[in-house]
């Protein structure tokens, strides 16, 4: 709905009559805001002192800006029911909202042509007219000058002279024109056009006179109509194809008289005043409308603040937000619970480890005490046995009187005892070794050991112990209950028997007492002789019986109220009895241990006594041996004859006989040896019992050691399987690394090939660009020979002044099209180019590889240089380019000095020389980078974004620590960046090149001034999606490129996910260096 006119770049020759007609009528004012002279009228146009220029104009447009809600009242009436109920239904509907916007359009405006000046553009550069001119007044602008706020400022084109007073074309021509034949032909053409246009102007003047005559009648008839309708016949309606736009106003020609000119001027002045008034009113209305809209916006904000925030999200977004919040809360709760659980488990493990360490220390100390005790006992036993063995060896070796059958029986027993003691000592040593190993293992807790199995084993053992204790308690309780019940039953039976016996005896006594008087005489012999003593005895017996009966009665009376069950002990009593029994068992075991220790001490004392007795026996044996030796000497003396009666008697009286004095000694020794044997047997039984207890403990320890060995074997198997798994994983990882190395090598080779292809393509592009530049130069230097006579006003030696003042405007705006390469790969590659001037081949270009290049670009990886020489092609056919120049299509860079229907064959091209590297310019290499953001980009609210995750960094041109890409070469670079804000926020960023802003980005969109939008301050920012930079920039070597965030919040995650990226690639070097 924009009120605009399509722009026209320039008025062609076929529009000249229409332009002249509109000029004759006065023309219509056109908008001339910010005029830009870009083009001028053709030289053959009539009245060349006025020219149409292209200008820009601000126009107002009504555009749709969203929608607004309104409440609509509806009657809830059924179909065909005339008496409709009065109940109204209010519904909320939406309608589009339109606002007024401004835009810039391009239109035409009349101004003085170049070379003309003056108020009416009638003064030319060399205007020496001798004929007088009538005064030509500048057409007045009847409309009021527009203010700055009015975008449609109107200006009228100037009036032109009559055809009779027009300046001839030959008067404006320059003296340095072409030959007279061309000028004469051009003048003839112009004269014909002037005659034709003069005839058309006369017809238009007659039409205007008729219109003015009809104006008088129209004003009289339609005086009550609006003033705008009065000028309806005078305003020509613009058409879409019309070169002009706007309201046309009538203009009086100077040669035509009018009687109503003053009235028309008054009407125009009144119309202008009315328009000004309406414009003022409309401005005020617009201002008032803006204020009302501002007040409405403020009222809406107040209502929203009073009612609370309105829901602007959809149902799915609300559900998604609710689910996200719940998931976040659940995640936080799970993490907190896991942290607490881990902390509790850690504390529990530490507490259990401390308890286990303490328990191991206690076990170690107790085991050490047992080891010391056993060692002491073993040492003492070894010492005693050694002493006993040393004492027994000497008497056994010497012959004595006691060597008999019993001594021969006592030797094997002593040997058996020694063997048993040896076995006990060996078992004790083995037990000590095992205990030492166990203490060494338990004293130092293993940090990597798995205590779960041990805790499980301890729990199982504790459970088994508790179960056994409970079963034992139940067994003791049942046993005690049965025993107590049996004892009570026996007691009751015994009491009943005694009571029955007492009753019987009492009955007998009473019966005897009663019958004592009647049967006194027959019983007299049976009674004792003393009646007093008998009575006393009976009374004593009766009193004793009474006492017993009283005791039994008291006992029965005490047990009767409680019944039989009352006499039984309760569970607590039984438990107490069980505890007392256990304590008694423990005391018994302790007492037995003490008794064992006492018996061992007693055994030691007996051994000492035996030692002393053996010493005494040895003394006795020595005495007996001396006596035997004396008796032998006595016999020898008696045999030799030296006998004396007194000496023989003394010898016989002194030396006892072998039978008489030796018998009591041997009897005492036999008794002592019997006592010693009995004592040793008793001690041996005690040692056996102790050995059985130790053996049971050793068997328990062996069972535990066996369980540990089984657990270790299982752990060994598990560790072996884990080792095999580890080895398999190591082999698999090694194979994967080998594959990765192979892939890296393949990628490197592919990268080299791609880089070679890329360099070749860049070199080909540079060659094509150079060829297009050469073609443009050729087009500029070639003369034109196909223009019409009306346009061929310039000679081969120069141009007209008008064209010399604007050399840049005559250049073609589009580059010439290049002939594509032949598709046949077998044929020689040729490039269709423009023929050059004759002088151009004499001066080789600075880079001769491009004009005469006939080969294809370098292939990747080729190291050699292809040297080819262009051959002369066949004659080319006539081809017309954009500027009318002939061109040999099939020939190569040949010469075309003569314009004919058929071109000559092209000359051979220049041989290709190797490219010359510009000194001081490094050869470009592969440069590209790509990085993403996975962490917080900067510590503060804004700054340079540090894209930390580098994906590609060829050439090491990007520094993730600073977030800056440094260009290594001069050339063109493609820079891209994608920035994603957090939800419900925005991001405002700048792409900076060498600390200079190149592009800006705001994800919420660009925001204009509030005066233009009529929005109140404090409007809410509209959040948008991600934003991106994507542009090609020219960078010099050493320039730094980075992304700077100036507002908002940039999204980042902690899970190695990229939402924002920054990339760049080197396209090609700067063309001036190639």
UniProtKB/Swiss-Prot annotation:
Species of the source: Mus musculus
Gene3D superfamilies: 1.10.287.1490, 2.60.120.40
Top-rank taxon: Eukaryota
GO cellular component: collagen trimer; collagen-containing extracellular matrix; EMILIN complex; extracellular region
Biased segments, Polar residues type: 149-165
Subunit and interaction comment: Homotrimer associated through a moderately stable interaction of the C-terminal globular C1q domains, allowing the nucleation of the triple helix and then a further quaternary assembly to higher-order polymers via intermolecular disulfide bonds. Interacts with EMILIN1.
Disulfides per UniProt: 51-113, 77-84, 112-121
Coiled-coil regions listed in the entry: 181-218, 259-345, 374-394, 533-554, 582-620
Positions of the UniProt region annotated as Disordered: 121-184, 219-264, 627-661, 783-865, 893-917
Name of protein: EMILIN-2
Ranges of Pro residues composition bias in the record: 813-828
Cleavable signal peptide: 1-33
C1q domain location: 922-1073
Residue positions with a glycan: 58, 463, 514, 586, 615, 744, 995
């Amino acid at each position: 709905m924009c009120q605009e006119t399509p722009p026209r770049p320039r008025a062609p020759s076929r529009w000249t009559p229409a332009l002249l007609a509109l000029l004759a009528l006065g023309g219509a004012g056109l908008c001339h805001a910010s005029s830009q002279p870009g083009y001028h009228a053709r030289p053959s146009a009539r009245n060349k002192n006025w020219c149409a220029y292209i200008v820009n104009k601000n126009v107002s447009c009504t555009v749709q800006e969203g929608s607004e809600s309104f409440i609509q009242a509806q009657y809830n009436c059924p179909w065909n029911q005339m008496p409709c109920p009065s109940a109204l239904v209010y519904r909320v509907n939406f309608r589009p909202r339109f606002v007024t916007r401004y835009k810039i359009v391009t239109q035409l405006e009349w101004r003085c042509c170049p070379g003309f000046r003056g108020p009416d553009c009638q003064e030319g550069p060399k205007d020496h007219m001798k004929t007088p001119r009538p005064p030509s007044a500048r057409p007045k602008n009847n409309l009021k000058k527009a203010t700055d706020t009015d975008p449609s400022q109107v200006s009228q084109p100037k009036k032109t002279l009559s055809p009779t007073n027009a300046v001839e074309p030959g008067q404006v021509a320059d003296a340095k024109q072409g030959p007279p034949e061309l000028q004469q032909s051009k003048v003839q053409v112009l004269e014909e056009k002037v005659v034709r246009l003069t005839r058309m102007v006369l017809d238009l003047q007659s039409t205007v006179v008729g219109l003015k005559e009809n104006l008088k009648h129209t004003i009289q008839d339609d005086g009550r109509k609006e003033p705008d309708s009065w000028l309806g016949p005078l305003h020509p309606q613009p058409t879409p194809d019309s070169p002009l736009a706007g309201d046309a106003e009538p203009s009086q020609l100077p040669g035509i008289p009018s009687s109503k000119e003053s009235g028309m001027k008054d009407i125009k002045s009144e119309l202008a005043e009315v328009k000004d008034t309406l414009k003022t009113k409309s401005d005020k209305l617009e201002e008032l409308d803006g204020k009302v809209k501002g007040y409405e916006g403020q009222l809406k904000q107040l209502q929203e603040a009073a009612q609370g925030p309105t829901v602007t999200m959809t149902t799915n977004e609300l559900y998604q937000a609710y689910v996200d919040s719940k998931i976040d809360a659940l995640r936080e709760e799970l993490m907190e619970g896991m942290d607490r659980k881990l902390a509790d488990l850690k504390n529990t493990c530490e507490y259990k480890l401390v308890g286990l360490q303490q328990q191991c220390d206690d076990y170690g100390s107790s085991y050490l005490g047992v080891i010391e005790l056993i060692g002491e006992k073993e040492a003492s036993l070894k010492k005693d046995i050694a002493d006993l063995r040393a004492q027994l060896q000497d008497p056994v070796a010497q012959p004595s009187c006691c060597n008999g059958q019993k001594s021969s029986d006592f030797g094997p027993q002593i040997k058996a005892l020694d063997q048993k003691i040896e076995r006990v000592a060996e078992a004790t040593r083995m037990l000590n070794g095992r205990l030492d190993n166990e203490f060494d293992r338990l004293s130092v807790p293993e940090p990597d050991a798995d205590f779960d199995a041990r805790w499980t084993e301890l729990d199982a053992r504790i459970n088994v112990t508790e179960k056994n204790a409970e079963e034992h308690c139940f067994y003791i309780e049942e046993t005690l209950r049965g025993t107590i019940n049996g004892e009570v039953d026996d007691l009751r039976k015994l009491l009943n028997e005694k009571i029955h016996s007492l009753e019987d005896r009492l009955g007998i006594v009473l019966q005897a007492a009663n019958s004592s008087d009647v049967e006194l005489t027959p019983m007299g012999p049976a009674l004792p002789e003393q009646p007093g003593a008998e009575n006393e005895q009976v009374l004593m017996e009766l009193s004793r019986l009474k006492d017993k009966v009283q005791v039994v009665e008291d006992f029965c009376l005490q047990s009767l109220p409680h019944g039989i069950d009352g006499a039984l002990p309760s569970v607590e009593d039984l438990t107490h009895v069980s505890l007392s029994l256990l304590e008694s068992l423990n005391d018994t075991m302790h007492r037995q241990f003490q008794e064992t220790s006492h018996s061992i001490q007693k055994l030691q004392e007996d051994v000492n006594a035996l030692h002393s007795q053996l010493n005494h026996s040895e003394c006795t044996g020595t005495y007996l041996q001396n006596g035997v030796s004396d008796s032998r000497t006595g016999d020898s003396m008696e045999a030799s004859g030296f006998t004396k009666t007194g000496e023989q008697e003394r010898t016989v009286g002194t030396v006892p006989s072998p039978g008489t004095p030796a018998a009591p000694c041997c009897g005492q020794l036999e008794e002592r040896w019997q006592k010693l044997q009995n004592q040793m047997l008793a001690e041996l039984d005690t040692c056996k019992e102790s050995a059985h207890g130790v053996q049971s403990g050793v068997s328990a320890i062996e069972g535990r050691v066996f369980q540990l060995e089984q657990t270790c074997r299982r752990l060994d198997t598990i560790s072996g399987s884990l080792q095999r798994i580890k080895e398999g994983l190591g082999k698999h990882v090694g194979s994967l690394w080998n594959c990765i190395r192979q892939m890296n090598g393949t990628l490197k080779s592919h990268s080299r090939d791609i880089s070679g292809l890329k360099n070749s393509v860049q070199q080909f592009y540079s060659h094509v660009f150079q060829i297009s530049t050469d073609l443009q130069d050729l087009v500029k230097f070639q003369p034109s020979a196909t223009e019409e006579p009306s346009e061929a006003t310039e000679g081969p030696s120069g141009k007209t002044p008008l064209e010399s003042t604007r050399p840049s405007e005559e250049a073609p705006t589009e580059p010439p099209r290049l002939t594509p390469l032949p598709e046949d790969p077998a044929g020689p590659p040729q490039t269709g180019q423009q023929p050059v001037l004759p002088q151009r081949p004499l001066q080789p270009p600075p880079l001769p590889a491009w004009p005469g290049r006939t080969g294809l670009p370098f292939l990747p990886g080729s190291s050699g240089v292809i040297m080819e020489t262009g051959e002369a092609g066949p004659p080319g056919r006539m081809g017309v380019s954009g500027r009318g120049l002939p061109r040999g299509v099939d020939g190569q860079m040949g010469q075309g000095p003569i314009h004919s229907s058929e071109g000559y064959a092209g000359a051979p091209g220049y041989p290709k020389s190797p490219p010359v590297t510009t000194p001081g310019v490094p050869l470009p290499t592969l440069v590209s980078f790509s990085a993403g953001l996975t962490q917080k980009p900067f510590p503060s609210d804004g700054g340079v974004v540090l894209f930390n995750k580098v994906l590609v960094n060829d050439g090491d041109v990007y520094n993730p620590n600073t977030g800056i890409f440094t260009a290594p070469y001069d050339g063109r670079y493609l820079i891209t960046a994608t920035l994603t804000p957090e939800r419900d926020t925005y991001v405002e960023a700048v792409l900076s090149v060498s600390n200079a802003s190149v592009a800006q980005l705001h994800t919420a969109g660009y925001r204009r001034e509030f005066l233009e939008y009529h929005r109140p301050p404090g409007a809410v920012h509209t959040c948008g999606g991600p934003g991106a930079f994507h542009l090609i920039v020219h960078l010099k070597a050493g320039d730094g490129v980075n992304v700077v965030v100036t507002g908002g919040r940039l999204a980042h995650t902690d899970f190695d996910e990229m939402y924002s990226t920054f990339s760049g690639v080197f396209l090609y070097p700067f063309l001036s260096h190639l």
